Amino acid sequence: MTPRLFALIPCAGTGSRSGSAVPKQYRTLAGRALLHYTLAAFDACSEFAQTLVVLAPDDTHFDARRFAGLRFAVRRCGGGSRQASVLNGLLGLGEFGATDQDWVLVHDAARPGITPELIRTLVAALKDDPVGGIVALPVADTLKRVPAGGDAIARTESRDALWQAQTPQMFRIGMLRDAILRAQREGHDLTDEASAIEWAGHTPRVVQGSLRNFKVTYPEDFALAEAILARGTNAS
């Protein structure tokens, strides 16, 4: 049986660094909620069996009417960290018939620049891989190490062989679930799915990502994201 594809969007964060009282995934960019662009990209990929959005149990900002016409499901099972939210979402995918051998693509809600083309490029590159992998970009900037709390450069770090991780991150549901459970048992709260897979002793692959697929994090990021998204909206 051919493994199926599922998408998982952890959306339980508060976006504290974005400088807004409204979680960043619900901020309006180019006429739509930021989250809309992420959901629309996966909705355009009809090969996915389901897209599951994981919300915080007490989320009062989500309004399904803002995403009318898009195919996705919502479960209010978010945890206290990204890792916990992803784990709960993986467990929730079983409700939609997902098995351990099916693929899941975990994507940050705050990366609205994702495109169906990039999603399909990742799937095509990894669908026969025994582990899976992520989209990422080679580090282009010079890296400086600065001690915590300071502002003086301690040294320059080599950027050779360094890649900046993005999402989606694509792994078998069972492998990712077991890797996260192991990390939790051993007291590690990891910031992305590939880290959990690495912790379990596997070697994920990298697939070339895109500059437009950046994570909206700080207040100044919204203007850049809006410019990119507005251009795409006008082009369509």
Curated annotation (Swiss-Prot):
Annotated keywords: Isoprene biosynthesis, Nucleotidyltransferase, Transferase
CDD domains reported for this sequence: CDP-ME_synthetase
PROSITE patterns associated with the record: ISPD (PS01295)
Domain of life per record: Bacteria
Gene Ontology biological process terms, A to Z: isopentenyl diphosphate biosynthetic process, methylerythritol 4-phosphate pathway
Phosphoprotein in keyword set: no
Keyword Nucleotidyltransferase: yes
Class of this enzyme: transferase
Annotated site residue numbers, Transition state stabilizer: 17, 24
EC number: 2.7.7.60
Positions bearing the site annotation: Positions MEP for the nucleophilic attack: 159, 215
Metabolic or biological pathway: Isoprenoid biosynthesis; isopentenyl diphosphate biosynthesis via DXP pathway; isopentenyl diphosphate from 1-deoxy-D-xylulose 5-phosphate: step 2/6
Catalytic activity: 2-C-methyl-D-erythritol 4-phosphate + CTP + H(+) = 4-CDP-2-C-methyl-D-erythritol + diphosphate
Residue spans crossing the bilayer: none
GO molecular function: 2-C-methyl-D-erythritol 4-phosphate cytidylyltransferase activity
Family: Belongs to the IspD/TarI cytidylyltransferase family. IspD subfamily.
Function: Catalyzes the formation of 4-diphosphocytidyl-2-C-methyl-D-erythritol from CTP and 2-C-methyl-D-erythritol 4-phosphate (MEP).
Protein name per its UniProtKB record: 2-C-methyl-D-erythritol 4-phosphate cytidylyltransferase
Gene: ispD
